[in-house]
Design a protein with these regions (language model features):
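Conserved P-loop NTPase
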Residues: 103-150
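Switch/coupling sub-region of P-loop NTPases
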Residues: 2-105, 111-115
Length: 150
């Protein structure tokens, strides 16, 4: 059983896994600090409800230190713009471009949009890395199935 550590500002994720730990930010503990503390919990998977600030860099570094298979959400218009959004978030705490770190840590981006009373997968890209001045990606076909919240 993989040990999952779930980090959120607001408790929204429901997880049925037996080996899961849920932690939440507070007025005195922000997401970056929570992520750093998470490393001591020996996680196999790090799940962040939503990354909105420079904590994105801490998350990407954690994923690149033997904690693959993590999940987060980021608001953007397309799958490619999600990668650019991660660049913007990491720029809040680093003057160095972080495209290589993003290209190493992120494997898959799934873009979901609202559709009627539910949501649907708009686009899926596989991220293979960053080289030169662009992300190396493979685009998968659009999936048109509706996803309804339970």
């Amino acid at each position: 059983d993989d040990r999952m550590v779930i980090l959120e500002d607001t408790a929204e994720i429901r997880c049925a896994a037996e080996n899961a730990v849920c932690l939440h930010t507070s007025d005195t503990i922000d997401m970056a600090r929570l992520l750093k503390s998470t490393m001591r919990l020996r996680p196999d998977r790090i799940i962040v409800g939503e990354v909105r600030d420079g904590a994105a860099l801490t998350l990407l570094k954690a994923w690149n230190t033997g904690h693959p298979g993590g999940v987060t959400t980021v608001h953007s218009n397309t799958a490619m713009s999600a990668l650019r959004r991660l660049e913007q978030l990491t720029a809040e705490v680093s003057q160095q471009p972080m495209q290589a770190v993003i290209g190493e840590a992120v494997d898959l981006v799934i873009s979901i949009e609202r559709a009627g009373r539910g949501r649907r997968v708009r686009e899926v890209i596989n991220v293979e890395g960053f080289s030169g001045s662009r992300y190396q990606t493979e685009h998968y076909a659009q999936i048109d199935e509706d996803i309804h919240a339970a």
